[in-house]
Amino acid sequence: MSTSNSSIPASMPRWRQYWVLTKPRVTQLAVFCAVIGMFLATPGMVPYPVLFGGIAGIWLLAGAAFAVNCLIEQAVDAKMKRTSWRPSATGEVTPFHIIIFSIILGSLGMIILWNFCNPLTMWLTLATFVGYAVIYTWLLKPATPQNIVIGGLSGAMPPALGWAAVTNGLSAEAWLLVLIIFVWTPPHFWALALYRRDDYVQSGLPMLPVTHGERFTLLNILLYTLILIAATLLPYIYGMSGIIYLISAIVLGLMFLAYVIALFVSYSDALAKKTFRFSITYLSLLFAALLIDHYFL
């Protein structure tokens, strides 16, 4: 999961410097998907200790993972206009302090998940932390243009974390939610990479628009969007959802596809940015439709 950040003044209060290292908007979307997973896992209300403990624990571990991401990409972020303002890139927060901050957040998150949810949720969330901060950020991102595909599982895990928090297990329904986010991630991220490709050229990271060009990236966005639309029908086919979700999935999928086709036919950075932003709205509305369908049908 990713979101675009606008430029923020270099002089920030100390608390805000640490706050932005957690990438709060990305964390918010991840926690939202985890909460959806919690509610879909039960026909009734999620127990309040599990709900609020899960939110807090997942938020803290996600924030720790993003802070480690900022630490690992400190030199890369300094080269990119989109990320050069980050306190890690400017040196306003030192690597030592980022490590301590991440350890504190991660430890608190693990303790909360163990005590308010269950050990399975804690271990799954910790594995997601390692998958994102180490496997994706450190190993895959600088090595292959397919980094977002291969490493996408860690970003797709939040619904499964929420599901596990409630049920202390993972079922096929939980993995369907993971599949949707996994397939959604490439077109979402590559739209960003297209209109920020100059940044990625500067960074030296082998992102698809840099290594394979605009047209190849657009073709991949189109193909993954078609796969995504098919994947979003699976909850209905499997019997996990009803007609409200089905109609929503079709309408939202066609809207997303319209953006992608327009981008494929006549590319512009402005349209790529709109497509990227709509992809976030798309996922939020899709999961909201699942939740409404779950409780009202």
UniProtKB/Swiss-Prot annotation:
Coiled coil: none annotated. Pathway: Porphyrin-containing compound metabolism; heme O biosynthesis; heme O from protoheme: step 1/1. It is found in: Cell membrane. GO terms for biological process: heme O biosynthetic process. GO terms for cellular component: plasma membrane. It holds the Pfam family UbiA. The keyword Nucleotide-binding does not apply. It catalyses: heme b + (2E,6E)-farnesyl diphosphate + H2O = Fe(II)-heme o + diphosphate. Its EC number is 2.5.1.141. Gene3D superfamilies: UbiA prenyltransferase. It comes from the Bacteria. Its main location: membrane. Keywords: Cell membrane, Heme biosynthesis, Membrane, Transferase, Transmembrane, Transmembrane helix. GO terms for molecular function: protoheme IX farnesyltransferase activity. It is a multi-pass membrane protein. The keyword Transmembrane applies. NCBIfam families: cyoE_ctaB, PRK04375.1-2. Carbon 2 of the heme B porphyrin ring is defined according to the Fischer nomenclature. Belongs to the UbiA prenyltransferase family. Protoheme IX farnesyltransferase subfamily. Converts heme B (protoheme IX) to heme O by substitution of the vinyl group on carbon 2 of heme B porphyrin ring with a hydroxyethyl farnesyl side group. This is Protoheme IX farnesyltransferase.
